[in-house]
Amino acid sequence: EKCIVGTGLERQAALDSGVLAIVEHEGKIIYTDTDKIILSGNGDTHSIPLVLYQRFNKNTCMHQNPRIPGGKCIKKGQILADGAATVGGELGLGKNVLVAYMPWEGYNFEDAVLISERLVYEDIYTSFHIRKYEIQTYVTSQGPERVTSEIPHLEAHLLRNLDKNGIVGLGSWVETGDILVGKLTPQMAKESSYAPEDRLLRAILGIQVSTSKETCLKLPIGGRGRVIDVRWIQKKGGSNYNPETIHIYILQKREIKVGDKVAGRHGNKGIISKILPRQDMPYLQDGRPVDMVFNPLGVPSRMNVGQIFECSLGLAGGLLDRHYRITPFDERYEHEASRKLVFSELYQASKQTAKPWIFEPEYPGKSRIFDGRTGDPFEQPVIIGNPYILKLIHQVDDKIHGRSSGHYALVTQQPLR
C-alpha cells in the first residue's frame, strides 16, 4: 500500500522502474481484462498486453493489475496498470502497520522484532516467489536420453504428477522429492551386473541388452508450490551441442515467519523472533492490539530519530486519513519544524477523533498501553504509531541450512563450506 509519510519521490521512482503500463495514445478504453487492455483512439484499436505472474530478479513475481475500468477516456502518458510493488502509480513496497517501541520479555533484544499473528493470517506480508528448474537431454555415446513417464524402480506417488510425455502437468501441486521431468540415460552395464535371463539371451541369441539409469529432475529440499509454466525448448537437429531443454516454473507463496527480515526506511532492520497471538500483544486505549514491537534501544545509539517522527506522524495520518509528503532536512524552514508539524497533527487527530490519549501534553507522542496477557497498564508511556515497514528478500527459507557430517578443518575442527 501507499506510505502515509513519504518523500514525494515515490511517483518518480515508480515511473522510472519500468513496471507500469503507460498509455502511448489518447483514446477510450473499450475492454479490460487480466491479460490485456483494448484501447480505441484516432480510428485505430490498440491492444496493450499485461504481464501475468512472470519471474523477476531474485525469483520474485512480476504481475500487472489494470487501474482504469472500461469506458473511461484517457490521455497520453496516463498510467493504465500498476506493476510489481506500485500502488496507484506510486512506489508501494511495504505496509503501514501499528508499531510500539518497547521491550517485551527480551524477545526484541539485539534488534529482534516481535509481530502479531494478524500479519500472517491476513496475508499482510505474504509474498509470491517463482523458481525456475531446468533439465537438458543430450545424445550420449550409448544413444539419446529419453524423457518418459515410465521410470522403473520408483514409487508411484513420486510420478503422480507426470503426463504421458514424462513432464509435470500445469497446475500440479508439487512437494520436495517429487519428480518434475522423468528422464532415462542409456548406459552399457558390466557383464557381472546383468540379470541371469539377460545373460542367457546374450549367450543364445546374441542380443545386446542395454540398461538405463534414472536421471530425473527432482524438486530439491525446501521447494514446494504450484507449477505455473512448462517450456520445452527443442532446437533443430538435436545433437550434443544443442540439446533439448525443459524449463519448469513453480510459484511459491510465503507468509512471514520467524527468521524473516523486516525493515523501515531509516536503516531500522531486524529479524522476527516470535509471532504472538493477537490477544497477547500490547493493546491501545481504544482496544486495538499493536502489530509489531520494536526495541527502543535501536534508536538513540544509531541516531536515526527520523523513524520516531515518521511513526507519530503516521499515527496522525492514519486517524485523519491524510498522506504527507515531506522532503528530508526540512529543519531549514524553521527551528524544530519536524517536531512542530508532528505535534500539531497529533493534536488535531486527538481533537477530531475525540481520543485525548493520542496527544498527551505531559508526554507528547506517547500513550499509556496495556499488556494483552494481564490487562494491566505498562509502567511507562510508550511511543506508538504507523511507520512504513517492509519485508526484505533475506528470508529464512533461503538461508536455513544443516548437515549431519562432512569435511572439517584439521586445525580448528570447524566444518568447511
Curated annotation (Swiss-Prot):
Might you give the EC number(s) for this enzyme?
Answer: 2.7.7.6
Q: Enumerate the subcellular locations listed in this protein's record, separating them with semicolons.
A: Plastid, Chloroplast
Organism of origin is: Saponaria officinalis (Common soapwort)
| Role of this protein | DNA-dependent RNA polymerase catalyzes the transcription of DNA into RNA using the four ribonucleoside triphosphates as substrates.
Reactions catalysed, semicolon-separated, are: RNA(n) + a ribonucleoside 5'-triphosphate = RNA(n+1) + diphosphate
Similarity field: Belongs to the RNA polymerase beta chain family.
The record's section on InterPro entries has: DNA-dir_RNA_pol_su2, DNA-dir_RNAP_su2_dom, DNA-dir_RNAP_su2_hyb_sf, RNA_pol_bsu_CS
Note the PROSITE patterns from the entry: RNA_POL_BETA (PS01166)
**Name the record gives this protein:** DNA-directed RNA polymerase subunit beta
Name a biological process GO annotation: DNA-templated transcription
